[in-house]
Structure formats: C-alpha cells, structure tokens
C-alpha cells in the first residue's frame, strides 16, 4: 500500500481539486488560487453537513477578500477550526499524528502542499459523515489515477485518527474492524481490476486468434480449390501434399494453443467469480459494520443523555436535601401565617365597617347636596345684602362729607347773618329790607332743624329682622355640619372653596363700590360748587336741602345694614375657620389611615406569598400536600427509568431480530443466486449439442462471457 508521503503533494492537491469539483459549488474552483480564499471549502463543508456548518457559520466567511491575504488567512483559520471541531464533536475522532496545514502559506503564497493537507481534512469529513456512501460512490466514479490518490489519502488520514473517548473499547474495535474491512475492500478492488485487465488481454488474444483462424480457413479454402485443380494432396512428394501437411501441423498447433487459452480463460473466469463473491461479501460486511457504527454512535448519544439525566438527578437530590433543611423553619412560618391570618381577619372587619360607613356617607350625600344648595342661596342673598350695605356705606360717607361741608357753609352763613343784622341795626334801613333779611335768616334755622331730625331717624327694623333670621339659619346649618363629621368632609371642603370664591367676589365688589364712592364724592363736590355759585337763590337751596336729606336718609339706612352684616360676618368667620381647620385635620387623619391600611395589606400579601412558596417547596413526607411538585418530579424520574429499561430491552430484542432477518435475507439471496447461476450454466451446456463445430462452441462461450458481467452486476449492486 502507498502512503501520502511517497506521493508528490502537488499531485495530491491536483487530485483533491478534481474531487472538490464534483460538489458543483457556486464559487469557481478550477485552480489552486480559487481555493486560497476559503469560500469554496466553506461551501463544500456546508454541503457535507448542513446541520453543523449552517448559514450562520457560512456568513462568518468573508467572500469579498480580493488580494488581501490577511482576510484569506482569517477565513482559512475559521475553516480549520470548524473541521477540527466537527471531527471532535460530531465524528468523535481526534487527529493525533497528522501535520495540520499552515494557513499562512496557503493564504499568502498559495502553497499547493499545504492546500492539499487542508483538502485532505475536508475529504476525511466527507467519508465519515452521514452521507458518506454518496461521496464514496462519487469517488469510485472518478478516474483510476485520481481514485487511487484519493483512496491513499483517506487511508493515511484514517490511520492518524483516533476516537475521543479512550474508554469506549467497543467503538475502538469497531473502528479498527472498519478500517481493516476498508483495506480488504481496496485490495479486492485492485485484484478485480487486475483480473479484469487480464481477461481483457485474453479476449484480445482470442479475437486475434479467431481473426487468424478465419484468415487461415480462407486460405485453406483457396488452397483446397487449388488442390482440386492441381495434384492430389495425398501425395506427400507433391508441393500440394507438402503444403497440406504443413498446414495440418500448423492447425493442430493452433488448436492446442486454443485449448490451452480456453482452459486459462475458464480458470480466470472461475477466479473472477470467486473474487466477485468475496467483494459482495466484503460489501455486506462493510454495510453491517456501517450500521454497527451508526448504532454505536446512537448508543454513545444515549449514554451522553443518560449521563446528563444522572447529573440532573444528583442536582434534584441536593435540592431535596435543601428542602428538608428548610422544612425545619416551617413552624415559625406557620405561626407567622396564623398571625397574618388574624391580622387579615381584623383588616377585613375594618374594611367591612369602612364600607358600611361609606354606604352611609353615600346615603347622606344627597342631603348634603341639598344643604349645599341652600348655603349657596344664602350666600347669594348675603352677597346681595353686603353689596347694598357697601353701597349705602359708601353713600353715607360721601353724604357725611357733604353734610360737613354744608355745616361749614351754614356756619359761614350764620356769621354773615350776624354781620348783616349788625349792619341792619346800624343802618336802620327800610322795613321791607328788614323783612327780607329776617326771611333769609329763618331758612338756615329750618335746615338745621331738619338735619337734626335726619340724624335721629337711622333705625331699620326690617334689616335687623333679616339679619336675625340669617343668623339663626347659619347656626342651624353649622349644627348640622358639626353632626356629620366624617360624612360631610367633602361637602365642607366644597363650601370652603365656595366661601373663598365668594370672598374674592365681595372684594371685587368692594373695589367697584369704592370707585362708585369716588364718583359720588366728585358729584357732591360739584353740587357744593353749584351751591356756592347759587347761594343767592332760595329755590335752589331748598332743592339742594331736600336732596341732601334724601341722601342722608339713604346713608343712615346703608350704614345700619352694613354694621349688622359686618357683625354677622364677624360671628361667622371664627366658626368658618374652625370648621376648615377641623376638615383639614380629618382629611389628614383619613389619609394616614388609608396609607397604613395599604402598607399593612402589602406586608400581608408579601408574607402570604412567602409562606406559600416555602410550604410549596417543602418535603411531602413531613408536610403532606405542601410540595406536590417534588413528588411529581420523583414519579417522573421513576417512570423515565422504567421507560428507559423497557426501551433498552426492546432495543436489544429488535436488534437481535434484525440481525437474524438480515442473515436470513443474505443467505436466501446467495442461495438464489447460486441456483440461478447453476441453472444458467446447465442450460448453456445443454444447448451445446454434439453436432456443433468447435468454432460454434467458441462463439457461444464468447457471447456468454460478454453477457455474464451484466447478469452479475445487479446482484452485486443489490
């Protein structure tokens, strides 16, 4: 057997390049430079095992590398790592003594020898994957020289491989037996090729001899004709007789040679049949070993799964131990749960009572709405009365100022009157002038008396009665409000807001009244000026006095109403302030209670969830029904073990049954082939009668030999 070391690396690279072209990848792969970027090799690996070399792995290989040798080296490193991982993880093999390719030489210098080593690793992945029969068949269809180099590369690579798990003796023996069978198969194939070549040479010799025989027969016929025309051939002294004897001896020699070649041909045919049988047996053994290797791989996977499940079992046992330790704290948790349940019942009772109070508050809300409407109406009335009072107060002040100014005017007129009296006495004018002076002096006296009477008429009993009634209603409303503390908090708050709004409105109205007061004051000043201008006219002064009296009356009434309303407002303000403070205190207390309730509810929920989780994870032997998940897991483990044992038994049973069936099928097929072969030989011998000539028998033997491989091929392929 050859070794790759005896071959030229360039020849190996060229042969493997021819093998790579059978994959029909998208990237060009005609020369060594086409393979240095690694794209072709990555696509070939994806076709070999698409599940392992998936699209994500293929996307890591950069396609547009150009002449950048660093990117080429990066791609080749990724491919080499993927091949080694595939051999270790999927094929369960490890390459020990094989020289790994130098990716730097491949990427930078396009080294054919190192590229041949890389392609040899890819070849090893192809002949060891699940679709290896397809790739081996493709190799067998290639040229003989390329096939020989590829098989030699496979043998060298397989000699360098070793299983990953050294403890798996059955897998090692199976791999050794598979290699031995592969070597025997290669030897049988080479022997078959040699025998086929020898048969071909013999066929060529037989054909040449037959042609020579036909030429001799033709020549013999010509000679016979000439003999008939010439002397008798029986006379040995004649030239024809000598020629006849010479041809007869030559014919005997040729017949002996023909018999000898026929015997050798039969021997080679028998040897070829035996070798074909051996090849079929070796192929059957190879198929059986392949199935055994697949079964060994599946058993190895099952062993890994069982090892993983045993690790899970150990982890679960550790968890069970931890749960048993946690079970010791169950008593404290139960006491905490009882305390939490008691607190929960207390909180539930409080909640029920609060809900009852809430229903009562909802029932009293309609009554509070009516009270609110009444208070709004009273406030509207109060605002109207306060407007009137402010207006009258303003008019009173203006009129008072006017009265003061008129009083000053009156004093001035009195002084003038006194001075006029003195002048009258001194001059002693006529009686008519004296009468006019007396009438002019009496008019101011009458105005003084009227002003004194206006000052006395200030009492307003109707306004006083209204204020008393409003005070009584206000007291009743306050008593009703104090009777429903928590139920009327919202209503009192709304009343407080309304009162504040009303206060703002009154302030605005007060500003408007002040403006009106300024206007009235300006009017009074104008009246005073007009009075000074028209002091000599008696009628005008009478009208002004009447207007002044009317203004004074209105001013007194407004002043009285304003004083009463101020007294009412002063009485209401402390109560209103007290009620607002009480409302704020009650709201703050209610808010604190609600926050405490929420905190207690959240704390209770946390404790309850924690207790449930701890009880759920405890050992069911000490706390029945507290942790059904652990018992369910144990039951599942036991059921899985039982199922595993039953599957193992069933697998052994089906394995033995399948082996027996395969043996029966192989033996039946072999017996049927032998019977058919014997029957065909007997028919062929029976068809050859004694009356046939030697040449006819030779032609039948040649035709049967040519048709024989066609009959044997289906049996071997099958």
Curated annotation (Swiss-Prot):
Sequence intervals crossing the membrane: none
GO BP: cytoplasmic microtubule organization; cytoskeleton-dependent intracellular transport; early endosome to late endosome transport; endosome organization; endosome to lysosome transport; Golgi localization; interkinetic nuclear migration; lysosome organization
GO molecular function: dynactin binding; dynein intermediate chain binding; dynein light chain binding; dynein light intermediate chain binding; identical protein binding; microtubule binding
Role: Acts as an adapter protein linking the dynein motor complex to various cargos and converts dynein from a non-processive to a highly processive motor in the presence of dynactin. Facilitates the interaction between dynein and dynactin and activates dynein processivity (the ability to move along a microtubule for a long distance without falling off the track). Predominantly recruits 2 dyneins, which increases both the force and speed of the microtubule motor. Component of the FTS/Hook/FHIP complex (FHF complex). (Microbial infection) May serve as a target for the spiC protein from Salmonella typhimurium, which inactivates it, leading to a strong alteration in cellular trafficking.
Chief subcellular location: cytoplasm
Region (Required for interaction with MSR1): 556-718
Organism phylogeny: Eukaryota, Metazoa, Chordata, Craniata, Vertebrata
Domain Calponin-homology (CH) intervals: 10-126
Start-end of Low complexity biased regions: 696-707
Quaternary structure annotation from Swiss-Prot or TrEMBL: Self-associates. Component of the FTS/Hook/FHIP complex (FHF complex), composed of AKTIP/FTS, FHIP1B, and one or more members of the Hook family of proteins HOOK1, HOOK2, and HOOK3. May interact directly with AKTIP/FTS, HOOK1 and HOOK2. Associates with several subunits of the homotypic vesicular sorting complex (the HOPS complex) including VPS16 and VPS41; these interactions may be indirect. Interacts with MSR1, and this association is stimulated by ligand binding to MSR1. Interacts with microtubules.
Compartment(s) where it occurs, according to its Swiss-Prot or TrEMBL record: Cytoplasm, Cytoskeleton; Golgi apparatus
Family: Belongs to the hook family.
Coiled coil segments of this chain: 167-433, 462-667
InterPro entries xrefs: CH_dom, CH_dom_sf, Hook_C, HOOK_N
Superkingdom of the source species: Eukaryota
Residue segments, region Disordered: 682-718
Chain positions with Phosphoserine modification: 3, 6, 238, 693, 707
Keywords of the record: Acetylation, Coiled coil, Cytoplasm, Cytoskeleton, Golgi apparatus, Microtubule, Phosphoprotein, Protein transport, Transport
Matches recorded under Pfam families: HOOK, HOOK_N
GO CC annotations, alphabetized: centriolar satellite; centrosome; cis-Golgi network; cytoplasm; FHF complex; microtubule; pericentriolar material
PROSITE patterns linked: CH (PS50021)
Positions where N-acetylmethionine occurs in the chain: 1
Protein name: Protein Hook homolog 3
């Amino acid at each position: 057997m050859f070794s790759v070391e005896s071959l030229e690396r360039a020849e190996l690279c060229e042969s493997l390049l021819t093998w790579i072209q059978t994959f029909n990848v998208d990237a060009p792969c005609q020369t060594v430079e086409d393979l240095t970027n690694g794209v072709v090799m990555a696509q070939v690996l994806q076709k070999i095992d698409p599940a392992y070399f998936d699209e994500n792995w293929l996307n890591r290989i950069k396609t547009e590398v150009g002449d950048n040798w660093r990117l080429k080296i990066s791609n080749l490193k990724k491919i080499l790592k993927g091949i080694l991982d595939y051999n270790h993880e999927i094929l369960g093999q490890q390459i020990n003594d094989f020289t790994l390719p130098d990716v730097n030489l491949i990427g930078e210098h396009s080294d054919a020898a190192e590229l041949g080593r890389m392609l040899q690793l890819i070849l090893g992945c192809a002949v060891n994957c699940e679709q290896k029969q397809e790739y081996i068949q493709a190799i067998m269809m290639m040229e003989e020289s390329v096939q020989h180099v590829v098989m030699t590369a496979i043998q060298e690579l397989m000699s360098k491989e070793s299983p990953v798990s050294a403890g798996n003796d059955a897998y090692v023996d199976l791999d050794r037996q598979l290699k031995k069978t592969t070597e025997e198969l290669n030897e049988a194939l080479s022997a078959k090729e040699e025998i086929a070549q020898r048969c071909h040479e013999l066929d060529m010799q037989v054909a040449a001899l037959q042609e020579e025989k036909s030429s001799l027969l033709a020549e013999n016929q010509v000679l016979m004709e000439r003999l008939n025309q010439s002397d008798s051939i029986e006379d040995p002294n004649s030239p024809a007789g000598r020629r006849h004897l010479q041809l007869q001896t030559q014919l005997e020699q040729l017949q002996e040679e023909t018999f000898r070649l026929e015997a050798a041909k039969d021997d080679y045919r028998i040897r070829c049949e035996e070798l074909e049988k051996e090849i079929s047996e070796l192929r059957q053994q190879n198929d059986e070993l392949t199935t055994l290797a697949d079964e060994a791989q599946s058993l190895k996977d099952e062993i890994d799964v069982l090892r993983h499940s045993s690790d899970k079992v150990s982890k679960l046992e550790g968890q069970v131990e931890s749960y048993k330790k946690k079970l010791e704290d169950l008593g404290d948790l139960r006491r905490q749960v009882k305390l939490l349940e008691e607190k929960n019942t207390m909180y539930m009772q409080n909640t029920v009572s609060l809900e009852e109070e809430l229903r009562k508050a909802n029932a009293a809300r309609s009554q509070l709405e009516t009270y609110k409407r009444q208070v709004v109406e009273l406030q509207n009335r109060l605002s109207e009365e306060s407007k009137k009072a402010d207006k009258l107060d303003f008019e009173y002040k203006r009129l008072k100022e006017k009265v003061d100014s008129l009083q000053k005017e009156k004093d001035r007129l009195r002084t003038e009157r006194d001075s006029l009296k003195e002048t009258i006495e001194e001059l002693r004018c006529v009686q008519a002038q004296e009468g006019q002076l007396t009438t002019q002096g009496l008019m101011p006296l009458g105005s003084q008396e009227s002003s004194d009477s206006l000052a006395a008429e200030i009492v307003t009993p109707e306004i006083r009665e209204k204020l008393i009634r409003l005070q009584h209603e206000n007291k009743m409303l306050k008593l009703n409000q104090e009777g429903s503390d928590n139920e009327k908090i919202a209503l009192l708050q709304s009343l407080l807001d309304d009162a504040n709004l009303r206060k703002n409105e009154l302030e605005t109205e007060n500003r408007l009244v002040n403006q009106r007061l300024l206007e009235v004051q300006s009017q009074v000043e104008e009246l005073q000026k007009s009075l000074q201008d028209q002091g000599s006219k008696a009628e005008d002064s009478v009208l002004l006095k009447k207007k002044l009296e009317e203004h004074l009356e209105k001013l007194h009434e407004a002043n009285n109403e304003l004083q009463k309303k101020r007294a009412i407002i002063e009485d209401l303000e402390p109560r209103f302030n007290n009620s607002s403070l009480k409302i704020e205190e009650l709201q703050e207390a209610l808010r604190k209670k609600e926050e405490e309730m929420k905190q207690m509810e959240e704390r209770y929920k946390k404790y309850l969830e924690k207790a449930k989780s701890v009880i759920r994870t405890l050992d069911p032997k000490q706390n029945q029904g507290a942790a059904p998940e652990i018992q369910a897991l144990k039951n599942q483990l036991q059921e899985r073990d039982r199922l595993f044992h039953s599957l193992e038994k069933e697998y052994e049973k089906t394995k033995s049954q399948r082996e027996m069936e395969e043996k029966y099928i192989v033996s039946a097929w072999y017996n049927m082939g032998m019977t058919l072969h014997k029957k065909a030989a007997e028919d062929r011998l029976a068809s050859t009668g004694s009356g046939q000539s030697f040449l006819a028998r030779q032609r039948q033997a040649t035709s049967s030999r040519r048709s024989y491989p066609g009959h044997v091929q289906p049996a071997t392929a099958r």
